[in-house]
């Protein structure tokens, strides 16, 4: 599956196609079962006066604050820290730093960013598949999961 993030929804103004690994698709489908058959994976619970059918930007931080209140020994973190966690996991998995940055839709700076227009879709797909395997193993509590770095392709 592919999730298309249009330019008007991305922080850097660049559209991106994000390859979704099978576990991510399964997690999204599981979330959708709670949506009462709406078009949204995360619908609004109440329409109220704002008249938008999906959750507000503040919903996840509010939910996270409730979870954090139950975990006083865990250092403070924000929703944005999940991106840092993803980037850290990709590094631990041996994903090329350039590919990992593109997984986060970060712009490449300097001359490299000007001349290199490759979207790295296949490389991002492989990286995100490996990350999904790690997350699935962690979700299942498998202590036997072994992180095996991706081998770099010869150019």
Question: Residue ranges of each PLM-predicted region?
Answer:
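A generic structural signal for beta-strand entry/edge sites
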Residues: 1-2, 39
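Catalytic-site neighborhood detector that most strongly recognizes the C-terminal catalytic loop/helix
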Residues: 2-13, 25, 48, 93, ...
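Short, basic (Lys/Arg/His-rich) helix/loop patches that form interaction surfaces
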Residues: 12, 18, 26-50, 58-102, ...
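Short hydrophobic short-linear motifs embedded
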Residues: 37, 145-153
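N-terminal non-cleavable signal-anchor helices
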Residues: 96, 100, 112, 148-149
């Amino acid at each position: 599956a592919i999730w298309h993030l249009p330019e008007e929804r991305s922080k850097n103004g660049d559209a991106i196609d994000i390859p979704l690994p099978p576990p991510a698709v399964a997690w999204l489908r599981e979330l959708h079962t709670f949506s009462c058959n709406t078009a949204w994976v995360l619908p609004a619970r109440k329409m109220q006066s704002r008249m938008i059918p999906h959750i507000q930007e503040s919903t996840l931080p509010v939910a996270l604050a409730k979870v954090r209140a139950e975990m006083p020994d865990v250092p403070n973190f924000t929703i944005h820290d999940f991106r840092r966690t993803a980037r850290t996991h990709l590094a631990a998995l041996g994903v090329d730093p350039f590919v990992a940055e593109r997984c986060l839709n970060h712009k490449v700076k300097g001359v490299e960013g000007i001349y290199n227009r490759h979207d790295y879709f296949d490389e991002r797909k492989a990286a995100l598949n490996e990350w999904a395997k790690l997350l699935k193993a962690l979700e299942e509590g498998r202590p036997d999961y072994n992180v095996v770095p991706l081998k770099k392709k010869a150019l």
